[in-house]
Amino acid sequence: MTKQTLTQLEQHDLFLRRHIGPDSSQQQEMLNYVGAESLDDLTAQIVPESIRLSQELSIGDSCGEAEGIAYIRGLAKQNQVFKSYIGMGYYGTQVPNVILRNVFENPGWYTAYTPYQPEIAQGRLEAILNFQQVSMDLTGLDLASASLLDEATAAAEAMALAKRVSKAKKANIFFVADDVFPQTLDVVKTRAECFGFEVVVGPAHEAVNHELFGALFQYSNRFGQITDFTDLFAELRAKNVIVTVAADIMALVLLKSPGAMGADVVFGSAQRFGVPMGFGGPHAAFFVARDEHKRSMPGRIIGVSKDTRGNRALRMAMQTREQHIRREKANSNICTAQILLANMASFYAVFHGPQGLKTIASRINRFTDILAAGLQAKGVSLVNNTWFDTISIKGLDVAAVNARALAAEMNLRFDADGIVGVSLDETTIRTDIEALFDVILGAGHGLDVAALDAQIVAQGSQSIPASLVRQDAILSHPTFNRYQSETEMMRYIKRLESKDLALNYSMISLGSCTMKLNAAVEMIPVSWPEFANMHPFCPLDQAKGYTQLIEELSSWLVNVTGYDAVCIQPNSGAQGEYAGLLAIRKYHESRGEAHRNICLIPQSAHGTNPASAQLAGMQVVVTACDKQGNVDLEDLKAKAAEVAENLSCIMITYPSTHGVYEESIREICNIVHQHGGQVYLDGANMNAQVGLTSPGFIGADVSHLNLHKTFAIPHGGGGPGMGPIGVKAHLAPFVAGHVVVKPGRESDNNGAVSAAPYGSAGILPISWMYIKLLGSNGLKKSTQTALLNANYVMKKLSEHYPVLFRGRNDRVAHECIIDLRPIKEASGVTEMDIAKRLNDYGFHAPTMSFPVAGTLMIEPTESESKVELDRFIDAMVSIRAEIAKVEAGEWPADNNPLHNAPHTMADIMDPAFDSRPYSREVAVFPSAAVRTNKFWPTVNRIDDVYGDRNLFCACVPLSDYE
């Protein structure tokens, strides 16, 4: 028996060995194949010596899963979860357990990617379509998006849309009613400054006194008042003002819709439809507009089309509006949204149905009526005389009330003007009302909830005026009326899940997306009530666990990036880009150089880069790339010199979007710095840097980090994401602040970029666990294994497909690009054909046509085993053999397994299949691996053009699914 030390038996590196796909013997086999002696040797061959770190990370040692869970459990226990009545867009909710277990905690839902391959994403596309239907029904408008990041950023998007579509072309003022949530106004002001818009804040009725392109109103407002805006909206629209409304999704169940009042755009948070507060997120925002504004909508929209068999099929509609195509001309930089949370909200609506939602909303309103009636009976004065769930109280001894509230472990809202706010929610019960009476009035008030309820039933309630009571039906589609039993709901969720391919089935090799393992142990703390049920505006001394977690995570990210400070607030990668560029903008302004507004961006950049630069008020100048995919230094020098006086920054990705470590990266940074600019290094490819090099060491000034790529937060089928930024010391004073919660930085007075001070804080435990469990050595080894896997795949495939770009020593970084243009020229087979054929082999396609048209970009990540890599390689080799048959004329160019892919059960059941020049087995069982574990696409190839020409973005008849 081999003698082992106690340290070896304790297996502190067990998580590392389970996170990394290839075991030690597989790694050595792969190293031998690619021609390297060790991971360190391979690293030395790939990463330029000039940027290689000489010191190890100082994160600490790796630890076991049980140890990590115990540590983070200790942090969770430091959070005091008081009963929250703060409101302001964040409310307690009861997540149906059938949704919690089968969606939120299910890798079939949380590990999928954005549905760019709709044929293998019909399940979540249907769930998202349901979300759009809920949004349209409740707002009374025509077309909904497939979620935005939060209510405040949706408000900023609404302002931008208003400017795009308003006929008041000379107007430059956006009006914001003075009773909107303060965090919303904060984010709107930040965005308006970049666009050069003037924001005027005042009482709602004063909007007509200004020459506006748009206006924003809150329904109900932050004090709880609900107002019929019908006449005001008509007057504004007559003046070509685009009317936007921030609305409460639960209140809309009972209230007259903003669309019925004449609103053009309605948005808000869907959080209270079964999504925990999570100390600020993640939550999905809904965004709905009139049909006439559809081409100006931000974000993804799911639409109905048809497949090649003529069957209804779903896919993302009108993608030509979006950043990955339109770049700086896009409507928005929105990319990763909040699809997992939108799906949870849509399932919440499906599970409760219209009657269940009305019961919940009516109960909330009734409890608010009872609370108001009891207080008024005791002579307490209210600010508002109408309400759905919120009352605002004046004339109280604020200090005494606050002391009693804290003693009772509840949080009320205390405004600076002495007003005390109370917002009720789905979790409110009778004893809560009794406790509120005790806190607000003191003991011995003598009020009885049952008696007050009887009084309201007898006399009727006027809290919602008759003119504001919803008269039209909602959620009449059968989907919202047939799954109210848990058995049916469980099966509906499973039926949709089975239509989608996620990481729990096979690898997803999307280049630039880093679809690595989202380990179960990392996910577990997210559901804990100590993290899930915290209000983002609670007193910070109640959130000591969150505070310590954020501080530790931030310090680790500082160490990993080589920067001096981190701002956690941005709640997506695109939002991080925007936040980083804002820091650069404010830095230049502080130096009296506000004229510096030109952003240099290489041709190969992600589409979000130019879109974000445009949002930050910058002018984009594109720099060329050479034939090897590197930044053309001579072109960069010329353009930097040409615009030197106005140069703000460069945005560059490293390793490059071509999948190589550019040797000249430090020279690129120096060129920009010499001309007074800053270097923004896009963190999309950070998975190839951690432990080997860093943006700060390279010479960059600011980066965003995709925690949903490099640091293991799952993609959720299109969100959530987190995009914190790291900055050098000179930019630290200019990162995002927050008007409600002061993070305690020099930047407190800066505007916010997200609604919550720490963004989607509820998912930060995932990245914390990832880093804690791996430790310094594990993080580095993960990066090195990602390089090994990519080079193994590249070398294997290079025998069958040309590899477009390689770096030093004929190596790639963490991803490789195969060039399919010669194949297309020789055979007519396109990258789309190959992508769809991969579905038949049980794989999601790699990234198509980015950064070069006619290519596939493959990123295997460190989490995939050699067995899975070989299965993917075998599929690609088999597909190349199929292409050869087309090239040889054995199969017609318009009738072969690639052209007809993907294949469905309907295909092989069709007698007409006999006329095809290939067998049913070739169609659906093209490999031995598929025969033992088959994934069935449920639709054939989808006609995108038909869908956009016949735009339909609502629930379709159930008969279309039968």
From Swiss-Prot:
InterPro entries: GcvP, GDC-P_C, GDC-P_N, GDC_P, PyrdxlP-dep_Trfase, PyrdxlP-dep_Trfase_major, PyrdxlP-dep_Trfase_small. The modification N6-(pyridoxal phosphate)lysine is found at K709. SUPFAM superfamilies: PLP-dependent transferases. Keywords: Oxidoreductase, Pyridoxal phosphate. GO terms for molecular function: glycine binding; glycine dehydrogenase (decarboxylating) activity; pyridoxal phosphate binding. It catalyses: N(6)-[(R)-lipoyl]-L-lysyl-[glycine-cleavage complex H protein] + glycine + H(+) = N(6)-[(R)-S(8)-aminomethyldihydrolipoyl]-L-lysyl-[glycine-cleavage complex H protein] + CO2. Pfam families: GcvP2_C, GDC-P. GO terms for biological process: glycine decarboxylation via glycine cleavage system. It comes from the Bacteria. Coiled coil: none annotated. CDD domains: GDC-P. The keyword Cell inner membrane does not apply. One of its GO terms (cellular component) is glycine cleavage complex. Its cofactor is pyridoxal 5'-phosphate. Its EC number is 1.4.4.2. The glycine cleavage system is composed of four proteins: P, T, L and H. The glycine cleavage system catalyzes the degradation of glycine. The P protein binds the alpha-amino group of glycine through its pyridoxal phosphate cofactor; CO(2) is released and the remaining methylamine moiety is then transferred to the lipoamide cofactor of the H protein. Belongs to the GcvP family. This is Glycine dehydrogenase (decarboxylating). It comes from Shewanella sp. (strain ANA-3).
